[in-house]
Amino acid sequence: MDTLVPINVYVKAGIHIGTRHLTKDMKPYVSKIREDGLAIFDIRKIDERLRLASKMLSYYEPNEILVVGRRETAITPIKKFSEITKVKAFPGRYPPGTLTNPQLKYYMEPEVILITDPIMDKNALHDAYESGITILALCDTNHTKNYIDFCIPANNRGSKSLALIYWILAREYLRNRGVIGKDEQLKVPVEEFETKITVEE
């Protein structure tokens, strides 16, 4: 089966570059440890999980999905993803209680949540778990799968990696729901999903 984008596109975005810490949960998705200690994801496994995640999300209406991501490099990708798919999103800080406190004016009851970083977005992760919401998450090599129903292994830090991930998810969501043709591309290029920051962390 062909990959969702050519392998070299994944490589160029650095989607496979993990961290120097590798948990037992993420070991099955890693192909090697580089000489500098960085764990490297198996790109075909990333592709397979992105394909499955897109399929899962496509079973839900846009208003039944919430996407969160506090990391600076996630803000533009999430905004673009939300704009194109009409999915609800919290780019930036997630207000605690959004999923658990009906008294809040921004309270919502999504069926599924997509979390960009289970560590940085831990408030959203815990709220979703308490509410019984299906949890999908982008997991780097240093994460565990605690509370997570479906893990997408990937570099969830880099601006290019996150741009490509959310671009693919947007395209596949729209394709699977019949909004665009099976071979149709998004009218918005992947570059527009990228957060432009002057100094990389």
Swiss-Prot record:
* Swiss-Prot/TrEMBL keywords: Ribonucleoprotein, Ribosomal protein
Keyword Ribosomal protein tagged:
yes
- GO terms for cellular component: small ribosomal subunit
Classification via Gene3D superfamilies? Glucose-6-phosphate isomerase like protein, domain 1 (3.40.50.10490)
Please provide, alphabetically and separated by semicolons, the GO molecular function terms listed in this UniProt record: structural constituent of ribosome
Name the InterPro entries for this protein: Ribosomal_uS2 (IPR001865), Ribosomal_uS2_arc (IPR023454), Ribosomal_uS2_euk/arc (IPR005707), Ribosomal_uS2_flav_dom_sf (IPR023591)
The processes (GO biological process) annotated in the record are: translation
Give the UniProt family note: Belongs to the universal ribosomal protein uS2 family.
PANTHER family according to UniProt: 40S RIBOSOMAL PROTEIN SA
Q: What is this protein called?
A: Small ribosomal subunit protein uS2
Q: Which organism is it from?
A: Nanoarchaeum equitans (strain Kin4-M)
Gene this chain is encoded by: rps2
